Amino acid sequence: MTMRPFFSAAVHHLASPRGGAMPLFLRRGGTQIFFNQGCRATQFATPRDLLLPTGRKSYHSSVATFSSSADVTNGHFMSYAMLYHDSVAFLLSNQLGIPVFMAEDPKTPVDVAKEFNLSVRGASALMVTLCRMDVVKVVKDSDDSVDEILYGLTASAKTYLSDRKDRACVSPFIDTFQTNFITPDALLESCLKGDEKKDIMSEHLEQDDETVANNARHFMAHMNAQSYCCARALPKALGLESVKKPTTLLDVGGGSAIYTIEAIQSNPNMKGIVFELPAIKVITQEYIDEANLSDRVSVATGDFFKDPLPGCVDYVLFSNIFHDWPDEINMNLIQKAYDSLNPGGKIVISELLLADDVKSSTPAATSMNVIMMPYTKGRQYRPKELLRRLEKVGFTNPKVINLVDDYDLVIGTKS
């Protein structure tokens, strides 16, 4: 059980014509490229087979077609255009706290309407959409009206949506997509020629240390929800649980240290180093102290654009780093990782990858690729692109393994 349906339901919307954007602090300074609608909309695209009509009972299955082939309809284009509204329903439900309200007992739309001062018609519309998304399931059907259906939370929704105090809850991450929207004009601006225009990520990093730290604290708190499942899956994926000798993992740009903490907790032979900006160190240390790992995890400060990475380590981890930056910077990071590793050490790149055959890419990956346009100077990579780059630097036995859901690890070994 993972949070894929909910995490993946937030990215697709961001790449749609009025998709949800990133947190408020990333608003572009001089140019008004976002506007607040006050409506709650997003979702990282659900798996393709859930998004597209199946032909069994789709809304358009009986619509007459004008194609020369009876097997070709316009349904999937219509579906993509309309999915924005599913995102709106999902985000509004999260904002209201419907999953929290339903955590203990099944509810009808009438119950939901009464609790949140909604119309029964409105509550029913939300519940039908949440049911398709596997947030709720039908406990008792009604032949008379969807307004009378009794719904209960699914097991995955109970784990990832119903308790905001639980680290596994993805709701804080979903909250970040509630207010800002990438407009078509903003997306066009980011797609136009002109290397001189600044991306929002770079503008954020150029602020004073206090502002960078405050923004980072806010950002980390929300992004931990996104990283939870990936971080928990990392030790098993890398075989860290069976390490027999002292081993050091370097987490570059590790922020809240969520990956490092999970790795170190998996094995007493593991130690960790989080490499972060000086302005971020205090915040990273707070997370380490909270996990009672200050004796095994340290914070090294520096700027990975300018400074060498700490040396004599056995793993160098880049999690969601490469998609933020252009290729020349990433090649430099790969070289720095190679230089910092002990012989036999491994570089580990965790990313939401496009498919080598781009048509087979997941909706989450293609949507994230579009999201990168206004926010960063980067993009999502294909596996073969990263494998080739590792080989160019000198890494051997490059491979790709699945981490969790749509996230993969690209791994290379230093000879």
Per-segment meaning from a language model:
Residues 23, 46-47, 54:
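Short polybasic linear motifs
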Residues 1-39:
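N-terminal chloroplast transit peptides
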Residues 394-415:
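Core SAM-dependent methyltransferase catalytic element
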Residues 71-110, 114-247:
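Conserved Class I S-adenosyl-L-methionine-dependent methyltransferase catalytic core
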Residues 166-361, 407-408:
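Conserved adenosyl
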Residues 55-68:
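N-terminal mitochondrial targeting presequences
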Residues 348-393, 398-399:
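C-terminal alpha-helical "lid/dimerization" subdomain adjacent to the S-adenosyl-L-methionine
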